[in-house]
């Protein structure tokens, strides 16, 4: 069968836009499509180590120079010609739900913000912050040692999680910083939410959205700029037309961007803000410490408490679980809990202040751990546990001030054992904790050193739900279910891109 006519999950699609500069480097950068036999098995051999490439700084390295845990001081080589190359990665054949005689499971994805590999005790024995709930999740499921975020900053990673594709494919770089639109997810783009809705799931997102949405002014003109003045122009009686409800989610409660950082300090419920902001945020009473900077002087709504944002998000997720149990317990659900913790400023809730011996940021990490524990506890209490896959990860590595200050004051390294932090191409910027739990399906206490990326969640959910991904969706997503269910050692991917 001609390569381009092979089924989506039986091929690796490579899309190139070659320039003269790339052509000069063909001898150093020859990529061949993968071929499959009649059983659609991957006809490739496991490599001793994997490669991690930057979208803007990319070329294969000799096998002997690939990164491993002992390569922390070796930089990614400065590579040529990547900006003109788009590489499509598709999911490879995997164990199906039917083969394992499984009903469609509920899926819960908990995404921390700026939580480093070394911030979690089960990844870092020298961590100064206790994370008993995340550690327990690892003991009850599978811990991945080589998981990566598709980007080293918030917005591109979230776009990739929601779409299963790299954000550079739509020309996006950087971070969405305000209330201006439009949504960065294209209108007709298949998302993880819309895919699961098509498969009969109830879908919900609670927390930060951070991939853009459009407000309108009183004249009905869309607000497309960020900053204080555009926020002042918003007509809050008009609905949002390109938010989570229009990108695959039945329920949404959260914020447009970082709830304690950006210009609009107000909650969105569904497609509008029920309690609009009325004044400039007063930062005078906010905590003062090395981790307290980073919030802009935006507009704030009455009752919006910057120190209790994550507890509000947690309560909304718990209310969703309880309501689903009462109204439609036999219908599968997808819950995406998108936390603010532990993004700067480090404003742990009042119940968590001085909960650790690692300062306010340590307390914030402890609050994130509490959130994980509270959600898992509620899922189990409601009887959802055995048929729910819980995934936990972070959108990128730890922030620069947190790493620098925590190293000095508490001998805690949130990037340990990797070099680099958030925004870096170094391993510490994109290697993230990733844990999966599914009782009686995923072996408790197991560990995988497979190289995976957060883009892989969508293809995995497609297999779990019985969805068939079209060729123009989730191009960079690989199904990791064979590793989760069967602990397959067959390599999921040859390399990982990040931007």
For the regions a language model picked out, list residue spans one by one:
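N-terminal cationic amphipathic segment used for targeting or macromolecule association
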Residues: 44, 50-53, 57, 61, ...
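Short, strongly patterned local motifs
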Residues: 1-33, 44-71
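Generic alpha-helix initiation/capping and coil-helix boundary signal
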Residues: 8, 12, 16, 33, ...
């Amino acid at each position: 069968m001609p390569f381009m006519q092979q089924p989506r999950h039986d091929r690796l699609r490579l899309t190139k836009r070659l320039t003269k500069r790339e052509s000069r480097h063909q001898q150093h950068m020859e990529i061949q499509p993968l071929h499959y036999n009649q059983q659609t098995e991957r006809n490739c051999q496991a490599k001793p180590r994997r490669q991690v490439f930057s979208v803007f700084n990319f070329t294969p390295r000799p096998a002997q120079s690939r990164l491993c845990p002992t390569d922390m001081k070796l930089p990614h080589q400065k590579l040529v010609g990547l900006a003109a190359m788009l590489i499509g990665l598709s999911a490879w054949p995997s164990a199906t739900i039917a083969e394992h005689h499984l009903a469609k499971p509920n899926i819960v994805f908990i995404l921390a913000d700026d939580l480093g590999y070394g911030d979690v005790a089960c990844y870092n024995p020298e961590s100064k912050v206790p994370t008993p709930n995340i550690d327990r999740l690892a003991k009850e499921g599978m811990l991945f040692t080589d998981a990566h975020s598709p980007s080293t900053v918030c917005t591109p990673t979230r776009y990739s999680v929601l779409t299963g594709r790299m954000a550079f494919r739509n020309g996006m770089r950087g971070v969405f910083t305000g209330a201006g639109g439009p949504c960065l997810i294209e209108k007709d783009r298949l998302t993880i939410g819309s895919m699961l809705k098509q498969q009969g799931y109830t879908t919900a997102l609670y927390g930060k959205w951070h991939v853009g949405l459009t407000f309108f002014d009183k004249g009905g003109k869309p607000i497309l700029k960020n900053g204080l003045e555009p926020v002042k122009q918003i007509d809050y009686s008009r609905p949002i037309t390109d938010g989570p409800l229009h990108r695959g989610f039945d329920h949404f409660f959260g914020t447009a961007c970082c709830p304690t950082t950006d210009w609009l300090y107000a909650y969105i419920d569904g497609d509008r803000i029920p309690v609009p902001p009325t004044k400039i945020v007063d930062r005078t009473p906010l905590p003062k410490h090395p981790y307290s900077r980073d919030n802009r002087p935006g507009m704030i709504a009455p009752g919006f408490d910057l120190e209790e944002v994550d507890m509000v998000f947690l309560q909304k997720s718990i209310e969703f679980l309880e309501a689903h149990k009462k109204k439609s317990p036999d219908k599968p659900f997808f819950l995406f809990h998108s936390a603010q913790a532990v993004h700067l400023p480090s404003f742990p809730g009042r119940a968590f202040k001085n909960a650790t011996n690692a300062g306010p940021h340590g307390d914030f990490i402890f609050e994130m751990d509490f959130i994980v524990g509270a959600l898992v506890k509620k899922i189990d209490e409601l009887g959802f546990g055995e048929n729910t896959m819980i995934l936990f990860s972070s959108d990128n590595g730890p922030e620069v001030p947190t790493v620098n200050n925590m190293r000095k004051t508490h001998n805690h390294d949130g990037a340990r054992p990797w070099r680099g932090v958030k925004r870096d191409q170094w391993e510490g910027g994109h290697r993230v904790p990733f844990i999966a739990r599914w009782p009686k399906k995923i072996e408790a206490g197991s560990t995988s050193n497979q190289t995976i990326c957060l883009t892989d969640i969508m293809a995995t959910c497609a297999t779990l739900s019985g969805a068939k991904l079209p060729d123009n969706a989730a191009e960079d997503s690989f199904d990791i279910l064979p590793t989760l269910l069967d602990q397959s050692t067959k390599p999921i991917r040859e390399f990982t891109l990040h931007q």
